[in-house]
């Protein structure tokens, strides 16, 4: 829970139950709903995202409606609470990480083929 608290305080959009009053539930984060092998990838995304959100003064308006794995790739659905258009460099950043995710093993985070969910080592162990 302390790790979740740290992450949510640094990246509030990781809180799956964030409301417009910024009331946080520190019991889990969006990271908990995603493949564990993508953790470093998502944290890298969040670090770069925070820089851009700070640049545009959008940290308090930024939300993630859903983050999931689909067809071996990250899908990150975000929006701004005031209904304004997302800055293009934020859109581009999210797309970059969605693309990168298809080459990261969902179990261990190693490099993998884009046509399989896991690297060769994890496939041998788990499948």
Language model regions located:
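Short cysteine-rich clusters marking metal-coordination/redox-active sites
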Residues: 105-108, 119
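A domain-level signal for the structural core that forms small-molecule/cofactor-binding pockets
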Residues: 90-93, 110
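Residue-level marker of regulatory loop/turn positions in helix-turn-helix DNA-binding domains and
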Residues: 97
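Flanking scaffold residues of small Cys/His-coordinated metal-binding clusters
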Residues: 100-103, 113-114
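Ser/Thr- and Asn-enriched, surface-exposed coil loops between beta-strands
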Residues: 70, 115-116
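Glycine-rich phosphate-binding loop of ATP-dependent small-molecule kinases
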Residues: 5, 100, 109
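Cysteine-rich micro-motifs
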Residues: 116-126
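Long, charged N-terminal interaction/targeting segments
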Residues: 1-91
């Amino acid at each position: 829970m302390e790790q979740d608290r740290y992450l949510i305080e640094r990246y509030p959009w990781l809180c799956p139950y964030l409301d417009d009053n910024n009331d946080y539930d520190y019991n889990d984060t969006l990271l908990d709903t995603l493949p564990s092998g993508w953790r470093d990838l998502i944290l890298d995304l969040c670090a770069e995202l925070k820089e851009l959100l700070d640049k545009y003064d959008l940290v308090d308006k930024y939300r993630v409606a859903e983050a999931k794995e689909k067809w071996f790739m990250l899908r990150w659905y975000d929006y701004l609470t005031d209904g304004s258009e997302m800055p293009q460099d934020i859109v581009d950043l999210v797309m970059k990480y969605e693309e990168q995710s298809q080459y990261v093993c969902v179990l261990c985070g190693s490099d993998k083929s884009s046509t399989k969910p896991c690297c060769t080592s994890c496939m041998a162990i788990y499948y």
